């Protein structure tokens, strides 16, 4: 979609609790796409690097500031209850989306929900007869049982903790295996870029780090990114290592380990600023899933002069910028709550 924005095919975009300026590959191209939009709105509960580029920021609420249901990867549907009121003008995401539809007047009757419970009732109807069938789950039943597994096609059905235990969803009940043909990565190594760069996560941080980079204990545990390299590359622990790809370069302290391949380097991606890993990654897309090829691109390494800085999380105008870990240091102070988290900002 951001590529379509860059070409002018998409004119306006609303993002909900996402931060592509940190989490998506080839950050420079992502920035060009957002800058090409005629209108850009972000909905989030903390300001992010992507919010900083938006025309309008609408304050969303945290999960504990509303009630609803959540489905995890194993198919278990659980209910969460409201623990606190959202501050200021912050509102749940569903309310904001419905209100935008109402004010635009475009199929507003399709968004005439007054609670998250009403939205769940719509899901029960829409999923009836499908593989992920929620129709037998009631609001009260989910809460009283602590969770129900889909499919659950009737209110007296126990749910399905183990999917396909008796038969698979084919006429003969048997599984289907689909062998795939191996494809090389979109960007192969060569004489100029002889190594492979892969990116990933750390235990202390989550996704783009927009929440975890504000929590002192987590910043103290993992204050900044590094580059993991094999001893054969000739670096010592803590050396500044410059990683270069066809899109950009950044310099990190070396973490020298024997558990990584000799032809591969690894960088965690949760940070913004000059040390953002996704400055360097390739934005080639899988032809079927359209998922970017995050995990492999060609690179080279050389000894750097200084370690690049990370950027602290954005805060609203007027809020003190003393988020723990700002500027690359860590301390044990509690994170500063952005003032007026519920204030819409242009």
Question: PLM ranges: what are they?
Answer:
Residues 20-25, 30, 47-51, 65-68, ...:
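Flexible loop/turn segments at secondary-structure boundaries
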Residues 32-36:
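Short, conserved loop/helix-junction motifs that constitute active-site signature segments
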Residues 45-81:
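Flexible glycine/proline-rich, aromatic-decorated loop/lid segments
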Residues 2-10, 18-19, 195-204, 217-247:
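C-terminal substrate/ligand-recognition segments
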Residues 87-89, 93-145, 215-228, 235-346:
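Long, contiguous, secondary-structure-rich segments that constitute the structural scaffold
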Residues 2-5, 9-29, 42, 46:
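Glycine-rich anion-binding loop/nest that anchors nucleotide
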Residues 117-217, 329:
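Long, low-complexity segments enriched in small/aliphatic residues
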């Amino acid at each position: 979609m951001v590529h379509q924005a860059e070409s002018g095919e998409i004119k306006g975009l609303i993002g909900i609790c996402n931060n592509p300026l940190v989490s998506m590959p080839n950050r420079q191209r992502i920035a060009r796409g957002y800058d090409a939009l005629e209108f850009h709105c972000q909905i989030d509960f903390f300001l992010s690097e992507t919010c900083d580029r938006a025309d309008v920021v609408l304050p969303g609420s945290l999960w504990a500031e509303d009630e609803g249901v959540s489905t995890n990867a194993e198919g278990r549907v659980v209910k969460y209850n409201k623990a606190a009121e959202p501050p200021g003008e912050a509102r749940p995401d569903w309310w904001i989306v419905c209100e935008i539809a109402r004010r635009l007047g475009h199929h507003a009757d399709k968004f005439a929900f007054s609670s998250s419970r009403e939205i769940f009732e719509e899901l029960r109807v829409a999923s009836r007869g499908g593989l992920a069938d929620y129709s037998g789950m009631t609001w009260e039943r989910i809460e009283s049982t602590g969770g129900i597994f889909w499919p659950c096609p009737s209110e007296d059905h126990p749910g399905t903790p183990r999917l396909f235990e008796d038969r698979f969803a084919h006429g003969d009940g048997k599984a289907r295996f689909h062998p795939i043909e191996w494809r090389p990565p979109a960007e192969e190594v060569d004489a100029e870029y002889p190594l492979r760069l892969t990116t990933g996560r750390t235990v202390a941080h989550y996704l783009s780090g927009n929440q975890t980079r504000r929590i002192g204990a987590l910043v103290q545990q993992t204050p900044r990114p590094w580059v993991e390299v094999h001893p054969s590359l000739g670096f010592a622990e803590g050396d500044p290592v410059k990683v270069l790809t066809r899109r950009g370069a950044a310099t990190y302290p070396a973490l020298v380990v024997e558990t990584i391949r000799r032809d591969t380097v690894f960088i965690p991606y949760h940070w913004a600023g000059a040390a953002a890993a996704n400055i360097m990654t390739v934005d080639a897309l899988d032809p079927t899933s359209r998922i970017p090829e995050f995990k492999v691109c060609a690179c080279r390494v050389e000894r750097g002069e200084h370690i690049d800085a990370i950027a602290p999380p954005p805060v609203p105008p007027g809020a003190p910028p003393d988020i723990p870990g700002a500027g690359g240091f860590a301390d044990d102070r509690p994170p500063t709550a952005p003032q007026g988290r519920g204030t819409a900002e242009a």
